[in-house]
Design a protein with these regions (language model features):
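Short aromatic-glycine motifs in intrinsically disordered, low-complexity regions
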Residues: 11-21, 84
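Short coil-to-beta-strand transition motifs
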Residues: 19-26, 104-110
Length: 159
């Protein structure tokens, strides 16, 4: 009997399913998911070695990367059994609204949620929301994800 995707995952389990590892895997835990939604938590916004942190701290727009990692994880969970998830990239973000200038000053775990609004084999549209532990909005918006699109490197262009 083949087992389906897990209901919950820790940091190591998430890192095995998304294209980031080590400190660049920002998510700590998969809390819940359905074919259309995902809920993850993270405390990496408080870490001094967060790779997105600048001299000014971890700025609010970095919440988009937290949401993007949740979307990538969701894609791996909904992939057909026995197949690899489609590699993808964020093509655009729209209607983004920030409720905090910095994330590193937020106490408690970030609550990261993404909802699949539409999509097909080559693109997916998600709504995302990042809140603090009390539910205060830190960032929200929509993201268009393009799947299975080869990106030429400068070395291969024109070859």
């Amino acid at each position: 009997m083949t087992q389906g995707p897990p209901a919950q995952l820790d940091h190591a389990g998430i890192a095995r399913r998304i294209p980031h590892s080590g400190t660049m895997c920002l998510l700590d835990r998969l809390e819940a998911w359905t074919p259309n939604e995902i809920h993850c938590t993270a405390t990496s916004h408080t870490h001094a070695d967060n790779p997105l942190r600048s001299a000014s701290g971890l700025l609010g727009p970095c919440a988009i990367e937290y949401a993007a990692q949740a979307m990538a994880l969701h894609g791996s969970l909904v992939a057909a059994p026995g197949t690899s998830p489609s590699p993808g990239y964020i093509a655009s973000v729209r209607n983004v609204r920030f409720g905090a200038l910095r994330l590193d000053t937020v106490s408690g775990a970030l609550q990261i949620r993404a909802t699949r609004l539409a999509g097909g084999a080559n693109e997916v549209l998600y709504a995302f929301q990042v809140c603090d532990a009390a539910g205060t909005l830190l960032a929200e918006g929509r993201a268009a994800v393009v799947l299975d699109a080869p990106i030429d490197s400068p070395a291969t262009e024109g070859s």
